């Protein structure tokens, strides 16, 4: 009886392992994977590119206070559509994708994709009413990442300039680009793949900056400051955009 019981137990364990393996295989091609499966790349023929990253710029300051982590940082936004970051991203991504897919234009409102979660992204994607021939949307969106500049408990999202004050009036500054690329099924609105755009070793894209770059207020920025920040963001995006597309099997 004990031998029979052991056989049943082994069979149950084998069945459980089989279920787990099947679930893993199914999950590997489902939502929230970090790259397209071979089946996805064969099924997707036509895409549209949506970049909703470069309309606003965040100024985030963490003061030199003992309990600064208890409350939100001092944050201000600046409208930067005149920097033309999104059109540049869309042009670069479209050119890279055109080697593998047909790329079609799409009309969208950036505000619909500025603050998002996956359920909201599904609704916004289904509301696009794009060309029925489009199989998937490739979206470049603001992401929220842990603070790897000043190591506070706050998160950094989108494009911005971060400042953490230190004792003695010193400050640590960094320009960051926190974003991700998401592929959405145009018919169902479901997420096919999603991947954060990171530097090697999964690091937040950021560059150290001189404290003199911090303006009194966002609206007081000089042309030199605007040019420096725009150039820094372009450098970060150039370093991460195409490698992320390649890692997702969107581009060769």
Segments from the language model and where they lie:
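Bacterial N-terminal signal peptides that target proteins for export
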Residues: 3-18
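Bacterial N-terminal signal peptides
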Residues: 16-27
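C-terminal/domain-edge helix-coil "capping" segments
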Residues: 29-57, 167-252
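N-terminal post-signal-peptidase region of extra-cytosolic proteins
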Residues: 32-34, 77-79, 118-126, 157-168
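N-terminal segment of the mature soluble domain
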Residues: 58-150, 176-198
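Outer-membrane beta-barrel translocator domains and adjoining extracellular loop/strand segments
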Residues: 152-155, 208
């Amino acid at each position: 009886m004990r031998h029979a019981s052991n056989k049943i137990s082994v069979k149950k364990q084998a069945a459980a392992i089989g279920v787990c393996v099947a679930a893993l295989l199914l999950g590997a091609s489902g939502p929230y994977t970090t790259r397209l499966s071979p089946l996805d790349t064969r099924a997707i023929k036509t895409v549209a590119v949506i970049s909703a990253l470069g309309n606003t710029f965040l100024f985030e300051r963490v003061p030199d206070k003992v309990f600064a982590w208890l409350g939100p940082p001092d944050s201000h936004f600046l409208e930067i559509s005149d920097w033309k970051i999104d059109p540049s991203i869309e042009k670069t991504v479209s050119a890279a994708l055109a080697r593998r897919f047909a790329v079609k234009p799409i009309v969208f409102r950036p505000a619909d994709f500025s603050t998002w979660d996956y359920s909201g992204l599904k609704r916004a994607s289904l509301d696009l009413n794009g060309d029925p021939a489009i199989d998937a949307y490739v979206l470049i969106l603001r992401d929220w990442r842990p603070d790897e500049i000043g190591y506070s408990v706050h998160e950094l999202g989108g494009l911005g300039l971060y400042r953490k004050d230190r004792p003695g009036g010193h400050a640590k500054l960094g320009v960051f680009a926190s974003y991700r690329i998401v592929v959405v099924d145009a018919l169902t609105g479901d997420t096919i793949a999603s991947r954060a755009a990171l530097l090697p070793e999964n690091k937040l894209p950021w560059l150290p900056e001189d404290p003199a770059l911090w303006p009194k207020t966002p609206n007081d920025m000089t042309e030199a400051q605007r040019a420096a920040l725009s150039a820094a963001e372009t450098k970060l995006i150039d370093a991460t955009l195409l490698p992320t597309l390649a890692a997702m099997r969107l581009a060769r």
